[in-house]
Amino acid sequence: MKTYTATYSSPLGHIVIESDSLAITRLRFCCEKASAVPKEAPKEAVPTPPIIAETIQWLDDYFAGKRPCNVPRLDPQGTAFQKRVWQALFTIWYGQTKTYGEIARMVGCKSAQAVGQAVGANPIALIIPCHRVIAAHGQIGGYAYGTEIKKRLLEVENILQRRP
């Protein structure tokens, strides 16, 4: 199946969106720590399927400080356990957080570390809200794209301003 790629310029830097003709398969910040990150943001592929435009609208709403309503169709690839964890992340509403331990209990797993690994493997950052998962005792915890990006995403949702 053909892969489509587009780049979104966010207040936090470029975001690369990848899809097939029906669903988003990957969404990542260009500052990703992994070695497979392009040195510069790729140019938007033309033509792109409607799912790309839907995702760009979702991102526009998000970075405008609005709670995005319509989640684009997603097709993340992962293990059954990872997919269970990623599905649980959708229960964390915009402007809220949960701990790795809370997510572990939700998916019936005894290990918050295993949940942390699944959260870290999320291929569709931001839309699958892994940035809303924090460490115990309110610590911000890690993030595949760095804690500064995670902190800024939480600020977009006014989460950090409400915490003591």
Predicted regions and their residues:
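Helix-turn-helix DNA-binding helix
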Residues: 114-115
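Basic nucleic-acid-binding alpha-helical/helix-turn surface characteristic of O6-alkylguanine DNA
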Residues: 1-110, 156, 160-164
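…primarily DNA-binding HTH/wHTH and HhH modules…
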Residues: 137-164
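Residues in the recognition helix of alpha-helical DNA-binding motifs
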Residues: 118
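Hydrophobic alpha-helical packing residues
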Residues: 130-131, 153
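Short, basic, alpha-helical segments at the C-terminal edge of helix-turn-helix-like DNA-binding modules
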Residues: 132-136
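Major-groove DNA-recognition helix of helix-turn-helix-type DNA-binding domains
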Residues: 127
